[in-house]
């Protein structure tokens, strides 16, 4: 995930806040160890005691079969798509509270939304899975998801009460078979089994790739089962979807489509038979569609309806899409569905559910990462979109990664997503909060009971089939490549094969509608009701015959069997028609569009394996390659109108009520079957997309941009109206559709477009990139003349074919009349064989001529459409030229502005020079005045010594105190008036200079004082540093002395230990001697008792001698004990001294470190 940037990608990107998770009680939680450092997505893991399972890191002990060898294998430790971060302003925006029992009287407006508080809630969580509809027990199952960088693996059960106005929650105990924590997975409810596949998880298979197991939850016994299919499996992925289709009453198939793994997108389609999951030979089957495959896509939605798969929206390598793709398993092919009405914008991470005949699309994230809360409905029968009107009361916030569940009372339950939706404390306050207040979360319900009134026509069922555009076209018509671009569609689709697609014949959907309503609204199956006993093990699972048996549509709702009538060059499937079905079908039939060649031919299954490019060419080439039976056949374009076109396809058709070609049909069908057997399995197209912004946005539906009414176009020249009368034998389809390569580059055939679509497209301007080439009038006239010649040739061929057919019919009538008239003339065997051969040859020629007529007619029609497109292009170019001519001449204005700018620049330079010269003159004058003033001052100083001058000047000068000016007496007033002015100016200047000098002096003194202060501080710091260094040296010396003392103490201790050993050995020796003496003393006493007794004196002497010896030994023993005690005390003292020295050493080291740190901090 990124994920998911899901590294989207997820580089998938969290909310930025970490609110406490209060979805279950605190007693059921406990924190676990953090994830390994190489894991990017699961950055937080928790394992509760019960009810909730979190990611526990990667496990390698998984045994699974290998994936298909075509896929590239990536390490799990690669970057993942992370879910996009939610802007803070979008989290706590909440609408007004809605329906509660005490607030019903306060509501004045109708709303389809309702909010419900869910206590003990599993939410918030993002990109989880939930069952699409409730069971007969009103239960909903929720598994996995992501919240606040925690990936969940718990399984919750929500039970609805009181008409879905109240819910209760329980959890399922975690077992060994429980799926590990995952996000971005897919699930579907099938009978009494809840099927889960894929997702971004830490579990890997034996090859180190992402988990590719299928997990089945028995919703009765709550036991998990993991099938073990043999052979290749779909690669583990996230952002995909799974769905089921019941083929028979006891057979259900699981389909997996799309998804991504990091930057690799998938478009493979795999199917697994759920009915055989217990068999040892169960396996995955990889489907290869016949003609067309959607682009690699992820984060889309897929539903099952009418035994078909319907895909909407999603993210491709080129951007988001809003198209509807449909897969029909009966013919094994994909189709692009042409829809009308108010189409949703391109969106991803939205949610979809089926309600009756409607596909409901809620929320999602658009191409600008804006979160949507809009609701759209697609009528799957009329193929028309409807948008739910906006009801502001109770509407949920825009969101993505949420889930939808269809309830029994025509309501849709919306749960989870990337919004917190925490409930508030007050009981009737249904506003949401971005802070967990321990009151659970808010879930939303959408009431569809009045959907017919809110969206008129949403439930309408079409009564007739769409009118075909061209009567000469049959069920399959090749589509011409086009290079036009459409502005209103902002997403291209990856390349796909240039091929035609059939449109299914109209059929009755009444039984299918009834069954779908029963499945999605009532959801009670006969087999499901019969299950009452619990299942506690997998053996019990095997005993249940209907674990994977959903409702089976009746035969009337099944798609009719499609028969292959040709295997080259397009391998186009057709529908076997009834005898009265004479109308031919348009490529756009039943709002089901044939894929345009703008998909390109690189998505054909054969090229998918070989092509490693992430972006496939979308422009048409001059050669169209189509794989058949392992070979590539080239279809050359028609260079000349008179060149013959070989017919390669024959169709089962009617001529005057007689069916032809039954034997040839069966032969062609056998060839088609052989081709299918030789084809290899389908694989996904994978491509790395480091940045999708670099791709230019295009779209496949580009030809409809220029489709407008002919009366609204001012054509430069009217094309010739070519109409060819269809004979009774018309009704065949052409096999090939070939046009000139020169025309193929710029134009494409136009199909009938619904009125709404026409009106919308007519208002959209044509992209200028598609009309940059100017069409020459000579080429236009050439094409016109060529069309005229083709018309004449076609008419001639048609007349020849009609005449030939009439001749054959005449001969046949004559033969029948001869036979009926009872003629006795007998025809020999050789003549009959020749006649039969000639008839077959003529029939073949007739068919060939009819095919050529149809091909030429289609070519003529396409040429007319091309001319119409060219005419529109020319008209658009002329209008553009006129609009450009009417625009003002900006070049002349620019030149005038440039000239004016140059003039102003020259004037500016001149003014600058004048200003510079004026400044220089002022400076020179000031210098002259200064020199004159200096000479004047020197002269005044010389005359100052003269006393008479001073006395006379003192009598004449008076000081005016009021104005501060000096007034000079009249005798010298006239002579010194000008000098006084100069002197006053110079005096003022001198005062200013003195003031500045004083200020400079003061600042200098301040700086000098600061300098001295800093110098003193530096000297004091230097002294402190020296003192610290001396202390450090002293400490180092003490440390060295302590080390030496410790060494000496250790040496003394070693000496004492050696002496102690000596004492021990000596003590042992003395003990041995004492034992020996005791033994000898005992022997002597025994001998003395048993021997002859001597006199009492001799015995007394012996006793005295023994006692003396014993006393001596006792003294020695006591001395040794004393020495041993002293030695033990000395040893204990030495140990205490060593411990004290160690403590001192540690203290010294700590002090040294502290001093060093202080010194470093002082220096800094």
Curated annotation (Swiss-Prot):
The organism's place on the tree of life at top rank: Eukaryota
GO terms, biological process: cytogamy; establishment or maintenance of bipolar cell polarity; negative regulation of exit from mitosis; negative regulation of pheromone-dependent signal transduction involved in conjugation with cellular fusion; regulation of cell shape; regulation of cytokinesis; regulation of formin-nucleated actin cable assembly; regulation of vesicle-mediated transport
Claim: Zinc is one of the keywords in the record: no
Extra information: Present with 1350 molecules/cell in log phase SD medium.
Chain's gene name: KEL1
Source organism (scientific name): Saccharomyces cerevisiae (strain ATCC 204508 / S288c) (Baker's yeast)
Chain's role: Has a role in cell morphogenesis and cell fusion and may antagonize the PKC1 pathway.
Record-given protein name: Kelch repeat-containing protein 1
Residue ranges, annotated region (Disordered): 1-106, 550-589
UniProt feature, compositional bias: Polar residues: 20-37, 50-68, 78-102, 554-575
Annotated coiled-coil segments of the chain: 777-931, 974-1163
């Amino acid at each position: 995930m990124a994920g998911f940037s899901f590294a989207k990608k997820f580089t998938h990107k969290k909310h930025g806040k970490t609110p406490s998770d209060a979805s279950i009680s605190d007693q059921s939680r406990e924190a676990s160890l953090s994830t390994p450092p190489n894991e990017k997505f699961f950055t937080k893991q928790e394992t509760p005691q019960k009810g909730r399972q979190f990611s526990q890191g990667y496990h390698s002990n998984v045994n699974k079969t290998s994936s298909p060898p075509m896929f590239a294998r990536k390490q799990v430790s690669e970057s993942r798509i992370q879910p996009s971060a939610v802007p803070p302003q979008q989290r706590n925006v909440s609408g007004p509270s809605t329906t509660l029992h005490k607030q019903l009287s306060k509501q004045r407006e109708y709303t389809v939304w309702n909010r419900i508080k869910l206590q003990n809630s599993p939410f918030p969580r993002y990109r989880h899975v939930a069952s699409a509809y409730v069971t007969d027990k009103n239960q909903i199952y929720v598994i996995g998801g992501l919240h606040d960088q925690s990936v969940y693996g718990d399984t919750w059960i929500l039970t609805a009460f009181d008409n879905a106005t109240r819910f209760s929650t329980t959890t399922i105990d975690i077992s060994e078979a429980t799926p590990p924590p995952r996000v971005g997975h897919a699930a579907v409810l099938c009978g009494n089994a809840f099927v889960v596949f894929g997702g971004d998880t830490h579990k890997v298979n034996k090859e180190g790739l992402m988990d590719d197991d299928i997990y089945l939850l028995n919703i009765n016994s709550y036991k998990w089962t993991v099938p073990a299919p043999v052979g290749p499996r779909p690669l583990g992925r996230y952002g995909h979807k799974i769905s089921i289709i019941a083929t028979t009453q006891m057979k259900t198939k699981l389909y997996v489509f799309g998804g991504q793994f990091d930057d690799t997108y998938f478009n493979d389609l795999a199917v697994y038979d759920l009915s055989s999951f217990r068999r040892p030979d169960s396996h995955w089957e990889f489907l290869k569609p016949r003609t067309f495959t959607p682009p690699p896509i992820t984060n889309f939605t897929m539903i099952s309806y009418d035994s078909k798969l319907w895909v909407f929206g999603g993210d491709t390598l080129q951007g988001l899409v809003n198209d509807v793709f449909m897969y029909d398993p009966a013919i094994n092919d994909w189709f692009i569905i042409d829809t009308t009405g108010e189409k949703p914008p391109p969106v991803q991470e939205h949610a979809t559910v089926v309600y009756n005949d409607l596909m409901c699309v809620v929320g999602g994230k658009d191409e600008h990462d804006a979160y949507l809360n809009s609701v759209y409905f697609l009528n799957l029968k009329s193929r028309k979109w409807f948008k739910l009107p906006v009801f502001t009361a109770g509407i949920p916030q825009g969101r993505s990664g949420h889930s939808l569940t269809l309830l029994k009372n025509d309501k849709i339950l919306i749960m989870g997503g990337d919004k917190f939706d925490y409930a508030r404390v007050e009981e009737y306050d249904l506003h949401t909060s971005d802070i967990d207040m321990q009151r659970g979360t808010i879930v939303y319900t959408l009431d569809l009971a009045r959907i017919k009134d809110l969206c008129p026509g949403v439930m309408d069922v079409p009564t007739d089939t769409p009118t075909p555009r061209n009567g000469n076209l049959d069920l399959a018509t090749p589509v011409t490549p086009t290079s036009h671009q459409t502005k209103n569609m902002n997403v291209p689709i990856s390349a796909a094969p240039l091929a035609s697609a059939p449109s299914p014949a109209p059929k009755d959907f009444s039984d299918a509608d009834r069954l779908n309503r029963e499945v999605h609204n009532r959801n009670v199956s006969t087999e499901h009701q019969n299950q009452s006993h619990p299942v506690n093990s997998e053996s019990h699972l095997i005993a249940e015959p209907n674990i994977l048996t959903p409702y089976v549509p009746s035969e009337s709702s099944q798609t009719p069997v499609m028969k292959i009538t040709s295997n080259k060059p397009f391998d186009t499937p057709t529908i076997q028609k009834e005898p009265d079905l004479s109308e031919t079908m348009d490529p756009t039939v039943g709002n089901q569009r044939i894929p345009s060649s703008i998909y390109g031919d690189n998505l054909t299954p054969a090229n998918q394996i070989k092509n490693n490019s992430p972006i496939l060419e979308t422009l048409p080439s001059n050669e169209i390659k189509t794989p058949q039976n392992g070979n590539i056949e080239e279809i050359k374009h028609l260079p000349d109108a008179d060149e013959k076109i070989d017919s390669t396809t024959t169709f089962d058709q009617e001529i005057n009520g007689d069916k032809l070609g039954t034997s040839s049909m069966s032969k062609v069908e056998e060839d088609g079957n052989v081709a299918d057997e030789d084809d290899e399995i389908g694989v996904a197209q994978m491509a790395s997309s480091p940045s999708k912004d670099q791709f230019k946005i295009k779209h496949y539906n580009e030809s409809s941009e220029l489709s407008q009414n002919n009366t609204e176009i001012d054509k430069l020249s009217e094309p010739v109206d070519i109409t060819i009368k269809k004979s009774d034998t018309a009704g065949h389809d052409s096999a090939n559709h070939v046009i000139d390569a020169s025309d193929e580059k710029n134009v494409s055939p136009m199909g009938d477009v619904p009125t709404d679509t026409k009106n919308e497209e007519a208002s959209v301007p044509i992209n200028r990139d598609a009309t940059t080439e100017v069409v020459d009038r000579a080429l236009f006239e050439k094409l016109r003349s060529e069309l005229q010649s083709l018309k004449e040739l076609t008419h001639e061929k048609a007349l020849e074919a009609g005449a030939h057919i009439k001749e054959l019919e005449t001969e046949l009538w004559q033969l029948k009349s001869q036979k009926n008239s009872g003629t006795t003339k007998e025809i020999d065997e050789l003549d009959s064989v020749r006649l039969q051969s000639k008839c077959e040859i003529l029939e073949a020629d007739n068919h060939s001529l009819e095919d050529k007529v149809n091909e030429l007619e289609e070519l003529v029609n396409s040429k007319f459409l091309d001319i119409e497109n060219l005419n529109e292009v020319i008209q658009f170019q002329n209008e553009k030229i006129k609009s450009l001519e009417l625009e003002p001449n900006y070049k002349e204005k620019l030149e005038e502005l440039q000239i004016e700018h140059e003039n102003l620049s020259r004037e500016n330079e001149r003014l600058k020079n004048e200003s510079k010269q004026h400044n220089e003159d002022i400076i020179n004058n000031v210098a002259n005045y200064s020199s004159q003033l200096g000479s004047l001052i020197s002269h005044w100083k010389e005359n100052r010594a003269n006393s008479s001058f001073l006395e006379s000047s003192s009598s004449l000068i008076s000081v005016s105190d009021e104005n501060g000016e000096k007034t000079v007496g009249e005798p010298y007033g006239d002579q010194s008036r000008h000098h006084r002015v100069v002197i006053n100016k110079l005096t003022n200047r001198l005062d200013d200079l003195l003031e500045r000098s004083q200020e400079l002096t003061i600042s200098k003194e301040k700086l000098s004082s600061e300098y001295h202060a800093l110098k003193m501080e530096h000297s004091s710091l230097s002294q402190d540093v020296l003192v610290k260094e001396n202390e450090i040296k002293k400490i180092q010396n003490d440390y060295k002395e302590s080390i030496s003392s410790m060494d000496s103490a250790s040496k003394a201790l070693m000496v004492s230990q050696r002496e102690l050993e000596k004492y021990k050995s000596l003590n042992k020796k003395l003990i041995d001697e004492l034992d020996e003496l005791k033994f000898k003393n005992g022997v002597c006493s025994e001998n003395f008792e048993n021997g002859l007794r001597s006199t009492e004196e001799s015995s007394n002497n012996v006793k005295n001698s023994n006692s003396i010896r014993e006393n001596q030994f006792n003294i020695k023993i006591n001395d040794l004990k004393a020495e041993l005690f002293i030695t033990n005390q000395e040893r204990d003292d030495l140990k205490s001294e060593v411990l004290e020295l160690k403590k001192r050493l540690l203290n010294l080291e700590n002090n040294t470190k502290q001093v060093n740190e202080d010194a470093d901090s002082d220096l800094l």
